[in-house]
Amino acid sequence: MAAIHINHDVFNKYHTNGKLRLTTGYVQEAIENNGYPGHDGIVQVLKGKVEQGEQLGHAFTFRIRISDGVFQYNALMSADIDDQIKREVEHLVEGTIIALTKFEIYDQGEGAKNCFLIKGYKILSRYHQVLTSPEVKPRSHSGKPDEHKGYRPNIIIEDVWPEAEGMAADYQENMANPPAAKAPKREFGEEASYNRAAAPEATRARAVPPPARRTASNTERGVMPIAMVTPYVSNFKIHGMVSRKEEIRTFPAKNTKVFNFEITDSNGDTIRCTAFNEVAESLYTTITENLSYYLSGGSVKQANKKFNNTGHDYEITLRSDSIIEAGGELLAAPKLILKRVKLGEIAGYAGQLIDVLVVVEKMDPEATEFTSKAGKSLIKREMELIDESGALVRLTLWGDEATKALVDDYVQKVIAFKGVIPREFNGGFSLGTGSATRIISVPEIAGVSELYDWYANVKPTTEVKMMSQAAGGSNEAPRTIAGLQEMQFGKDSDKGDYATVKAMITRVNPTNALYRGCASEGCQKKLVGENGDYRCEKCNKNMNKFKWLYMMQFELSDETGQVYVTAFGDSAAKIVGKSAAELGELHDESPDEYNAIFERLQFVPKMWRLRCKMDSYNEEVRQKMTVYGVDDVNQDKYIENLKQMIEQMQQMSDY
C-alpha cells in the first residue's frame, strides 16, 4: 500500500495547532448551502466500498460514509475522479481522514435520502480511531436543511497527524519560541479559521486560539475567575464574553435608567452587571453582545435570585470609576451551562427562574397586541414546548421577542430557554419570560441530539400531558363532596387546593350560564346597558357589540352531599360541548334548544377537577369551589381507586 505524503503546503492549509481537527457541523452547513459551502471540510471515513453504477445521469464508482464528528452522512465518489479512486481505494476505509474539496448534493431519486456526490478530495491521514466527543453523540443526518438550521457547533474533535509529525513538531517549537526580532505570525489565525466559514466580527471572541500564542500582557495580569468574585475582594478584575445584553429600561417614578448585562468567562461562570443613569447610557453604547471585555471596579452585592439566574451568589453594580476594556480573544470559548428542569417537574419551581431544554411544538403565526387591565398596550406570542417528560407547556414571549421571532427558527427545533419562570394559574402551569430570559437556538450542549431523537422516534407514541391545564387529576384518588366540606379543604392555601370528585349535575340555571362581556381583546368585564349601547366600566368606553362569555353555576351531587360550583371559559365549554359564542347564538335564536342542552347535562356521572378555596363575604368565611376540568368516568381506574381506599380504611381499623 502506497504511503501518504504530506507536503508543507497541505500541512499549512489543513492543520490546526499542528493537529487534524474535524470540521464539526460541516455536513449541516453543506446541506443548508445545497452543496460545497465555499470552504473545504475535514471529515472522517467510517466505511467505504466499491459500487459502480449510474443514477439520474451521474456515474459513480465508490460509496463511503463520512462523519464530521457531529453528523454522519452518505456520499458517492463521482466517476470523474475514477483514476484517483483506483490509486487510493485501499486508503478509503474506516478511520481515514480526508478533506472534501469539491462536491454537490446528489438526489438519489424518489424515496431515497440525498447524499454528497464527491468530485474532489484529499487524503490527509490514516489509521485513526473513530473520532467523537463526549459532549455530543454523533447522529445520522436526515438530509433536511431545516432540521438543524443554523447549528454550528464549537466542539473541538481532533487528533495527532502522524504523516506530518515532523512539520507539527516544528510548528509547536516555533509557536513556543517565536523569533525575538519578528512579530508573531498570523498564519495560525488563518489556519484555525479554515475549518469553518469566517465568523462575523461580533462573534470573534468565541474563537479558540492556541494557549502557546498568548503572553501575559499588563491587561491580563491580576484577572480572577468570575466564580471568585465576592464582596470581600476589594479590587477584582475579570475577563469574559458578554453573553447577554438587555435593553435600557427607564422607571418613570424616579426617572431612573437601568442597564443590565451578563459576562461569562472561559470556565463557564457568569455574573450579572448593572449600571444606572449616565453610566448605563454610556455602557449601553459601548458593550456589544458576544465580544469579550476586561472589567474591574464596582460594588459587589448579593444577587437577587428572583431576577438573576446566572447561578452566581453575587452581582456587580458598575460605577463611573469602573474600567471596561476590550478583551480580545478568550483562551477558551465560554461554556453554556444549563441547570435544566424537565417540563414535567416545573410545578415544584413556581415563581423561580429556571432553565429548560425543549422542542418547540408549535407557536402563534403572529404576535398579538392587546390592552392590559392597567390600560397598557402589550404584545405577546405563545408557543407550546415539549421534552422527554412528555409534558406540553405554554410559554409566552413579550414585546420585541414576540415580534421578531420567526416560526421557522423555532418550530420543531431544540431551544434552550435560560431564566424562564413557571407560573401557576387555575391549577395549571405555564412558563413566562422576562428581562433575564435568554433564548439559545440549537445549543451546543449535551442532550440536544438525544432530545431530537426522542422527538422524532418516541414522542409520536407518547401520551402527552398538558401542564397548562389543571394538573394532578388523572392519578389522584377521588374525594367526596362531604369530605371536602367537612375538612374545609383549601383553607391552608391562599390560592386554594385541588381535588377530584365523582359527581353529577343535579341542578343548573340556564338563565345565568352566559353573560355579555366586553369585546376588547383581553377584557372579560360584564357590560352594562346604556342608551341602547353597552358600556365597559373597566375600559371606560361605550360599544355597540359584545362577546358571550361563560359564568356557569350549577349543583354537583354525589352519594355524600351537594355543593354549588362555578365554571368559566374553556372548562364550561367542555361541560356544555359548545363555545360561549355558539351557545349565545342559540340563546338568542332558539331558546328551546338552548334549555334542552342544560337538561341533557344533568344526572350524568363525571370526574370533576375542582379548586377549593376559602373566601370571605360579608364577614362570613365560606368555601368556594370552581371547576377546572371534567372528564368521563374511567370505570376501571375508579374501581381500582375504591379498592385502594378500602384497603387503607381496613389498615386503619386494624390499627
UniProtKB/Swiss-Prot annotation:
Residues 196-207 have a biased composition (Low complexity). The keyword Repeat does not apply. GO terms for cellular component: DNA replication factor A complex; nucleoplasm; nucleus. Keywords: DNA replication, DNA-binding, Metal-binding, Nucleus, Zinc, Zinc-finger. One of its GO terms (molecular function) is single-stranded telomeric DNA binding. It is found in: Nucleus. It comes from the Eukaryota. A zinc finger (C4-type) spans 518-539. Residues 195-217 are annotated as: Disordered. Coiled coil: none annotated. Residues 236-326 bind DNA. InterPro entries: Euk_RPA1_DBD_C, NA-bd_OB-fold, Rep_factor-A_C, REPA_OB_2, Rfa1. GO terms for biological process: DNA replication; double-strand break repair via homologous recombination; meiotic cell cycle; nucleotide-excision repair; positive regulation of nematode male tail tip morphogenesis; telomere maintenance via telomerase. Belongs to the replication factor A protein 1 family. As part of the heterotrimeric replication protein A complex (RPA/RP-A), binds and stabilizes single-stranded DNA intermediates, that form during DNA replication or upon DNA stress. It prevents their reannealing and in parallel, recruits and activates different proteins and complexes involved in DNA metabolism. Thereby, it plays an essential role both in DNA replication and the cellular response to DNA damage. Component of the heterotrimeric canonical replication protein A complex (RPA). This is Probable replication factor A 73 kDa subunit.
